[in-house]
């Protein structure tokens, strides 16, 4: 199902983070993501998996928009803060949305129990 608000370009990033620097990584990622929002990013979420891999799901209007934003922020102290905390970085996975049922915050339907 195509949602008219679905981003056309999505990237999944994955890292192994030095355990003692997880807070530093999360802070750097948050600040770097804020800077990218000011340069065309459509938002991102950071997750830590039960496999101790960290994942970020980022949405963009296009790969060109992503590349332009990353070029403008590549030398930021926030990116350096992240790099210092990374034990291993995996290649990004580029995703094309096919079906979209994510709901914006505050728009969740009522649950079956009437909640």
Q: Residues of each region from the PLM?
A:
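Basic/polar N-terminal segments that are highly enriched at the extreme N-terminus
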Residues: 1-4, 113-115
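Short structural boundary motif marking the start of a folded domain
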Residues: 7-11
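Short, surface-exposed ligand-recognition loops at beta-strand->loop->(often short) alpha-helix junctions
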Residues: 14-27
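Short hydrophobic/aromatic beta-strand micro-patches
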Residues: 16, 57-59
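A short beta-turn/loop motif at secondary-structure boundaries
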Residues: 46-51
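Acidic/histidine-enriched, glycine/proline-rich intrinsically disordered or flexible terminal extensions
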Residues: 94-115
């Amino acid at each position: 199902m195509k949602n008219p608000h679905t981003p056309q370009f999505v990237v999944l990033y994955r890292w192994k983070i030095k355990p003692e620097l997880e807070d530093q990584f999360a802070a750097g990622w948050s600040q770097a993501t804020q800077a990218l929002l000011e340069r065309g990013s459509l938002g991102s979420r950071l997750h830590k998996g039960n496999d101790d891999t960290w994942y970020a799901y980022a949405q963009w209007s296009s790969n060109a928009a992503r590349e332009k934003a990353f070029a403008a922020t590549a030398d930021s102290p926030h990116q350096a803060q992240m790099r210092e905390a990374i034990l291993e970085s995996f290649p990004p996975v580029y995703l094309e949305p096919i079906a979209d049922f994510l709901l914006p915050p505050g728009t969740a339907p009522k649950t079956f129990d009437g909640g």
